[in-house]
A protein has these predicted regions:
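N-terminal/edge-of-domain interface segments
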Residues: 2-201
């Protein structure tokens, strides 16, 4: 992350130092607006050009030569792992998420969802951990796919840009990294496998 207080890197921290007992999971139920499995089941119809284009297919995945491509997102393993509304991870970081019902707050430049969301926070913390999922594609590589901003009482804020492939991967696949033709030049990303509930990097 980059801080607006001088554009200095904000340290991500060492997961070994996480004290689960001091973690406070944030209840986001009021802003959840979909099931994560809906991501490629929707039809993203607007805004679109009225003219012939090579635009993204209406299901939100694929390209002009693969217009029917899709991916079945199965979050059964994630939901089965939830106990009393909490997902306990091997990193020691608990996340509040439901076993049933809406479990994601989607934002989008498509009209299906709002283009931004606000989540009220209070108290003090040394860092914040976010469990995120979303889509990206080849043409969105090396540009901001989204932005997270945390605002403080003193009027300042910290900003984290979500950039493919640095810290924003596609939900349906893992990056192939050989250190040669494809080298992210970034630490391995932790991935939560929705179908099994397993966390790995």
């Amino acid at each position: 992350p980059v801080s607006d207080k001088g554009k200095k890197p904000v340290p991500a921290g060492d997961f070994k130092a996480v004290d689960s007992a001091r973690c406070t999971p944030v209840d986001m139920q009021k802003v959840f607006n979909a099931n994560v499995t809906d991501i490629f089941r929707n039809e993203y119809l607007s805004p679109r050009s009225p003219y012939t284009t090579l635009q993204l297919p209406k299901q939100g995945i694929g390209e002009w030569c693969h217009p029917l491509k899709t991916a079945d997102i199965d979050d059964s393993g994630l939901r089965a792992t939830v106990r009393k509304g909490l997902l306990e991870t091997k990193l020691g970081i608990p996340f509040r998420t439901p076993a049933e019902g809406h479990n994601i707050a989607f934002t989008s430049l498509w009209d299906n969802y709002p283009d931004s969301l606000q989540i009220p926070l209070q108290g003090k913390a040394s860092r914040a951990y976010l469990l995120m999922a979303g889509s990206t594609n080849h043409m969105q590589c090396h540009i901001d796919n989204g932005v997270i901003r945390v605002y403080y009482e003193d009027g300042t804020c910290d900003t984290l840009s979500l950039v493919n492939p640095d810290n924003w991967p596609p939900i349906e696949q893992i990056f192939f990294e050989d250190g040669k033709s494809f080298n992210r030049h970034a630490p391995s990303l932790y991935r939560l496998r929705l179908k099994t509930g397993e966390l790995s990097n």
